[in-house]
């Protein structure tokens, strides 16, 4: 799966989009991913990280 966070493994989820008239349509939600350079085991590496992990400080950014 390409749209997965490399830190927390958050990926696509599916469910129903419900209109005002209560009609149901299947849809998917994707995580808000950003490509960042992060320090992994002392070396910089390019990762796909969700914004929740970026904001909570789970990723050490490389400069």
Curated annotation (Swiss-Prot):
The UniProt record lists the keyword Transmembrane: no
GO cellular component: ribonucleoprotein complex; ribosome
GO biological process: translation
Database matches in Pfam families: Ribosomal_L28
Entry keyword set: Ribonucleoprotein, Ribosomal protein
SUPFAM superfamilies documented for this protein: L28p-like (SSF143800)
GO molecular function, one term: structural constituent of ribosome
UniProt keyword annotation of Transmembrane present: no
InterPro entries tied to this protein: Bacterial_rp_bL28, Ribosomal_bL28, Ribosomal_bL28/bL31-like_sf, Ribosomal_bL28_bact-type, Ribosomal_bL28_sf
PANTHER family, alphabetized: 50S RIBOSOMAL PROTEIN L28, LARGE RIBOSOMAL SUBUNIT PROTEIN BL28A
Family, per entry: Belongs to the bacterial ribosomal protein bL28 family.
Protein name: Large ribosomal subunit protein bL28
Organism of this sequence: Alkaliphilus metalliredigens (strain QYMF)
């Amino acid at each position: 799966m390409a749209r997965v966070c490399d830190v927390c493994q958050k990926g696509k989820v599916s469910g129903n989009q419900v209109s005002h008239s209560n009609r149901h349509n299947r849809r998917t939600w994707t995580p808000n991913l950003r490509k960042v350079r992060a320090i992994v085991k002392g070396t910089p590496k390019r990762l796909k990280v969700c914004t929740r992990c970026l904001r909570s400080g789970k990723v050490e950014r490389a400069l």
